[in-house]
């Protein structure tokens, strides 16, 4: 029993730390909630600024009439600052840039442009075996950054589940649909098999292209997705298995994807088959769900 209380205390401490960290990641000046747009680029020139004639129009009270432009040509992008506008990069914060080649978030050193409260990133996403290019723009003064603290289901050691990792024979990939309807093929190195309340379950492990760790990543849905947890998906990281394939899935550490906090994220959704037909009353709560005092008292309610 003391072991259980020690575990609960440890996870609660992690939840507090994660809440602080996640609040910064999602609601900080450069967090996901500060995103004000995601614009897919076409070949040619895309202009940015407060003037409504620009391809991308920014708030008039915080942006210059013309901030700059992006040229996309042969799957390569470059940025040119408008005359008199100071634009900086993370690697050259002391001197403004006039023109610069853009490196995407799929590259080791992605380009991040900053001008006033605006932060501009260049991203590339696979869609049905082709690549699409886009700009993400954050506004560090966005009102969307104001949000309540994260909430969690009460920690329950029941949801710390022993699992066995079963590798997939040969190379395998799965078509993964994203929140914006894009289709990406991601590696499927193996499955996690486990038992809850005497019933057997399995989750497919997914490896994203930019993931260079040995940890296992799963995306899943369950019956709480209707209300208590975020409807689209939850994510969980799992420690690497031992030599016998043994590991632990701790659903108390399940967390929401970025798209739970902004409509401008490109979150992947779980593959078909990663739905658990039970109420996983553990992990992070749906940030948009307000508890109803009259809800079914037979289910655990987040506090």
Residue ranges of predicted features:
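Beta-strand-rich interaction surfaces with strong enrichment in secreted/lumenal proteins
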Residues: 99-100, 110, 191, 234-240
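N-terminal pre-domain segments of enzymes
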Residues: 1-39
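Extended, aromatic/histidine-rich regions of cofactor-dependent oxidoreductases associated
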Residues: 148, 225, 237, 246-248, ...
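Forkhead-associated
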Residues: 9, 35, 40-108
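Mid-length scaffold segments of soluble, non-membrane domains
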Residues: 47, 60-64, 69-80, 183-230
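Conserved, compact domain cores that house catalytic/ligand-binding motifs in diverse enzymes
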Residues: 145-210
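C-terminal boundary/linker segments immediately following FHA domains
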Residues: 1-6, 11, 82-83, 88-162, ...
């Amino acid at each position: 029993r003391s072991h259980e209380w020690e575990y609960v205390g440890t996870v609660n401490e992690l939840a507090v730390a994660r809440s602080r960290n996640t609040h910064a990641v999602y609601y900080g000046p450069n967090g996901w909630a500060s995103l004000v747009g995601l614009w897919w680029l076409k070949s040619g020139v895309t202009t940015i600024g407060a003037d409504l004639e620009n391809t991308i129009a920014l708030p008039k009270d915080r942006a210059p009439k013309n901030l700059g432009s992006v040229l996309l040509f042969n799957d390569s992008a470059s940025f040119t600052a408008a005359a008199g506008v100071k634009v900086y990069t993370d690697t050259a914060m002391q001197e403004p840039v006039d023109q610069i080649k853009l490196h995407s978030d799929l590259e080791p050193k992605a380009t991040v442009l900053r001008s006033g409260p605006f932060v501009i990133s260049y991203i590339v996403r696979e869609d049905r075996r082709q690549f699409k290019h886009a700009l993400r723009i954050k506004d560090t003064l966005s009102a969307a950054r104001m949000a309540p603290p994260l909430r969690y289901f009460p920690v329950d050691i029941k949801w710390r589940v022993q699992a066995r990792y079963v590798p997939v024979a040969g190379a395998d990939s799965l078509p993964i649909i994203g929140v914006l309807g894009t289709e990406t093929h991601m590696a499927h190195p193996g499955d996690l098999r486990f038992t809850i309340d005497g019933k057997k379950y399995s989750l497919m492990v997914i490896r994203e292209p930019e993931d260079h760790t040995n940890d296992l990543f799963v995306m899943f849905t369950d019956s709480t997705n209707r209300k208590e947890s975020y409807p689209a998906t939850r994510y969980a990281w799992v420690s690497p298995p031992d030599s016998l394939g043994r590991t632990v899935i701790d659903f108390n550490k399940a967390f929401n994807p970025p798209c739970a906090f902004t409509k401008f994220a490109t979150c992947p959704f779980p593959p078909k088959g990663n739905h658990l037909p039970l109420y996983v009353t553990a992990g992070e709560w749906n940030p948009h769900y307000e508890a109803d005092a009259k809800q079914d008292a037979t289910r655990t309610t987040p506090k």
